[in-house]
Amino acid sequence: ADGLTPQQVAALILVGLGAQAPSTARALADLTAPASAAGTRPRRPSETGAGVLVPPSRSLRAGDDGRLRLTVLGARPYEVVVGQDLAVDVVRGVTGAPGGGAGGVALIHIPELETRAGRYEDGLRAAGLRVERITVPGGETSKSSTVLNTLWEQLGRMRMGRDGCVVAVGGGATTDLVGFAAATWLRGVPVVHVPTTLLAMVDAAVGGKTGIDTAAGKNLVGAFHPPAAVVCDLTVLEALPLKELRAGLGEVVKCGFIADPVILDRVMTDPADIVRWDSPALSELVARSVAVKAAVVGKDLTEAGPREILNYGHTYAHAVEAATAYHWRHGEAVAVGCVFAAEVAHRMGRLSGDVLALHRQAFSAAGLPVSFPEGAGRFEELVEDMRSDKKVRAGAIRMVLLDDVARPARGLTPDAAVLREAHEAVTGAGPGTGE
């Protein structure tokens, strides 16, 4: 995919969705033509992870039942299904996992999802499976060694074998915690994720990252443990507060910038429609975002290289979260983090002013913040937080930046002056170049 225009990238993803529009055909017919380098400088291959961006042809499959399906490739391929009222797909995920759930099914959920978990339990029992319901606290505080130990004890009491299966029903914290419990029980049993927030659907539940927090920081203890299946049941979003839904769009828009320009078009064209849980537009955005992530993690599960591009915007976002004591939602911080990264890239001569402005326009259309006034005068504090970022090497802040939409570059080390100018632009303490 390196060297493709954004239109060609979008066309390939449209083919994955089964589209056959004339514009799609024209873009695909031009694949042999090199991308225009106007406004950008040539990049060395080592700088970019763009070579894994495009999902395999037909990777996104639209069924007659209205569901969108996608296979995440890798050593242990698994299916992601997106749609509404997917209780039957939860059962299919379990019975299709190694062992088929014969060794028992641990259905782990947060208290607020008692009723929905009950529906999944009914379906699993109807399939002849032995089911144990386990409740865990919601939110980041659940990702602790104490809660994890409780899960181990309960898995032991139910005598779960290697032919058993764990089902996680909840947000990103729940899928992180339960995924790690599954990764460590008997050195690994299958897990099926049923994410119940938009953020979890497009981010935490797909990719195989699991873990808990410690006193030293977030997600410092964990494992890569790909799920046996991911079921994105959009019906659960009906009860999600609008602000939480919008926060999930932060990762969606990020995916648009790093790989799929069609996402940006949908967000800016239908800003009201994309926050309706039952809208086809939202279903498409979830599927497209998952396709972007799947294309990357299928080639780089353990974040050895190209997977870093999924961290676009996260260097500054994590600093924003820390500076606000995590009062900012992750997707909100990612939105500002992407604007910061665009400011950095523009000041380094990599990114046009138009694409910088597009960052503010797209995230604003999604109802997300594009500035961080609380950070004014706190540059040194945020830089210190950025030095704790996992991409740091030998003390140097390394970032994922864009040369254009769908043209990410990784492993870049901006100097302190550029970082300060970008920080001042997003905090309002200095001139912004994309207003």
Q: Which residue stretches match the model-derived regions?
A:
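C-terminal charged capping/lid subdomain of soluble metabolic enzymes
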Residues: 41, 65, 250-253, 350-435
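Solvent-exposed alpha-helices and their adjacent loops that cap or buttress functional pockets
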Residues: 100, 159-161, 184-186, 212-214, ...
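ATP/NTP phosphate-donor binding region
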Residues: 49-165
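Short glycine/serine/threonine-rich phosphate/pyrophosphate-binding segments
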Residues: 173-180, 201-202, 318-319
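A glycine/threonine-rich phosphate-anchoring loop and its flanking beta-alpha core
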Residues: 180-273
